Structure formats: structure tokens, C-alpha cells
């Protein structure tokens, strides 16, 4: 793992439905890290991810991705470097697992003269990596919640990007599937050297899976640091207005919230 900044957000301002959400925000993300953004509802977490991915047009500021100003890049050029999975991704009614994962190859279709067989090999490799190859021809609508989320992760993986943004990837999943998806992301982070930036609501899961945590409130970044630096009673009181009791996970020594009032 390096200390190189792969993504830098400088002086960015964002609005949603004519309401200023983020004003002159600065934040950087280190290559190869799993960075988790936490904060109360409505604080701007999802808005920030949408602004970085250009789904939401910024009003001012600069975003630098892999030393390149994103304003100078086309949508397809960005899609080769950065993937974004929204909170509630949906597939066409009759789309199969393979159909959805193949969408991740879209940025390469017009310029690469690859045979269909070559593209199938790439998609099959991705499906195998996320343990979905046997379900490749199944309709996505027939899958469990955890399997569906693996499909979306596979689509992002097929993009062959260095950075993946995920907005609450564990939403609507039961606890077992939450752990399954986060373990998959951790594995991809290690094996593919993938930089992962995600929003999570569960503080203990955020602490467990993050290398770096970012605390947001009222459209501002108030705290940044390791889980041990962020998961403290004063910081959680400031962010969430809770009185938290913090302990230590005996397995990985990460901080955990034992109770809060």
C-alpha cells in the first residue's frame, strides 16, 4: 500500500434540488485504501459521491483522479478509472446476471476491437471472482439480496477501474449478506489493489472494514483518521448526538460501539 493520493477533491460545492448541500469541501483518498464515510442522514455523504462520479454537477471546485483533472476527461475515460454503485441499483426486468455484468464493459466497446469471445472471457473471469459464474444465465430478479449486490459489484469489477465508490452497499441486506458483501469488497481491495470509497451507516461495520474513516456533518468533513481515531465517544457525540461506550474487538483490535444512548 502506498501513500499516493489517487483521488483529490478540492474546494467543491454541490447543491441538490436548489439547496446547497456541500460548500467548499476538501478531501483526499489514498490509493489502495478502503475509506468509509460516516455521518447522520442528510449530511451530504451521498451527495459527495454523486459529485465525485459526476452524476451531480459541481458548482465549483476541482476533482483530480489519478493526477488528471476530471473536467478534462470524457465520460468514457472516467468510466475506465472510476465506478459508482448507487444505493438502489436496478436491472431491466429480464436481464440476466451476465447481461448486467457486461454493462461494465461499455467504456471499452467503441475503441477496442476485441472479439466477442475475448469479452466473454473477461466477464467470466469477473463472475468467477465473485462466485456467480454458475448463475450467469439466471435473471437477476430471481436472486437473493446478497447475490444481487454481488452482481453490481461484478459489474463495477468488469469496468477494470482503480477506484470504486459505493453508496450504502449493505442497505436492505440482512446481517449475513452484509458481511458477505463487505468481505467480498475487502478481498477485491487486496487482490485487485482496488481503492474503495463507501458510505456505511453501521458504525461497527465501518470500523471493522475501513482503513480510513471520514466523519461528515452538515455538508462538512469534521473528522478524518483511522478507526481508532474516529470511533471515540466525543467524536460520535458530535456527529450523531449519542453517548457511546467504545470497546475493542478481540479479533482485530478495531474499536466497536458496545452501547449508545
Task: Report residues per predicted region.
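Conserved ABC ATPase signature
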Residues: 114, 139-143
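Conserved ABC transporter NBD signature motif
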Residues: 29, 61-69, 78
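The feature captures the beta-strand-to-loop junction immediately N-terminal to the Walker
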Residues: 38-40
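Conserved ABC ATPase "signature" region
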Residues: 102, 117-135, 160
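Conserved structural motif at the start of ABC-family nucleotide-binding domains
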Residues: 7-9, 22-24
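Helix-to-loop junction immediately C-terminal to a conserved catalytic motif
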Residues: 53
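Catalytic Walker B motif of ABC-type/P-loop ATPase nucleotide-binding domains
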Residues: 164-168
Amino acid at each position: 500500500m502506498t501513500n499516493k493520493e489517487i483521488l483529490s477533491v478540492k474546494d467543491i460545492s454541490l447543491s441538490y434540488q436548489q439547496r446547497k448541500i456541500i460548500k467548499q469541501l476538501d478531501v483526499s483518498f489514498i490509493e489502495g485504501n478502503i475509506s468509509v464515510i460516516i455521518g447522520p442522514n442528510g449530511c451530504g455523504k451521498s451527495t459527495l459521491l454523486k459529485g465525485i462520479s459526476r452524476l451531480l454537477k459541481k458548482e465549483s471546485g476541482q476533482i483530480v483522479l489519478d493526477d488528471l483533472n476530471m473536467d478534462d476527461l470524457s465520460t468514457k475515460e472516467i468510466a475506465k478509472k472510476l465506478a459508482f454503485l448507487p444505493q438502489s441499483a436496478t436491472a431491466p426486468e429480464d436481464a440476466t446476471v451476465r447481461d448486467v455484468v457486461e454493462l461494465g464493459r461499455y467504456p471499452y466497446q467503441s475503441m477496442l476491437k476485441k472479439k466477442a469471445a475475448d469479452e466473454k472471457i473477461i466477464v467470466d473471469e469477473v463472475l468467477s471472482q465473485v462466485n456467480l459464474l454458475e448463475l450467469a444465465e439466471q435473471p437477476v430478479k430471481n436472486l437473493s439480496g446478497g447475490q444481487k449486490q454481488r452482481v453490481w459489484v461484478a459489474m463495477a469489477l468488469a469496468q477494470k477501474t482503480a477506484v470504486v465508490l459505493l453508496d450504502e452497499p449493505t442497505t436492505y441486506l440482512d446481517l449475513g449478506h452484509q458481511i458477505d458483501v463487505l468481505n467480498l469488497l475487502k478481498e477485491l481491495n487486496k487482490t485487485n489493489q482496488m481503492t474503495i470509497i463507501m458510505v456505511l451507516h453501521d458504525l461497527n461495520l465501518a470500523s471493522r472494514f475501513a482503513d480510513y474513516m471520514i466523519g461528515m456533518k452538515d455538508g462538512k468533513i469534521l473528522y478524518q483518521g483511522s478507526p481508532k481515531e474516529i470511533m471515540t465517544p466525543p467524536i460520535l457525540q458530535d456527529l450523531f448526538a449519542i453517548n457511546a461506550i467504545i470497546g475493542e474487538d478481540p479479533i482485530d483490535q478495531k474499536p466497536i460501539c458496545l452501547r449508545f444512548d
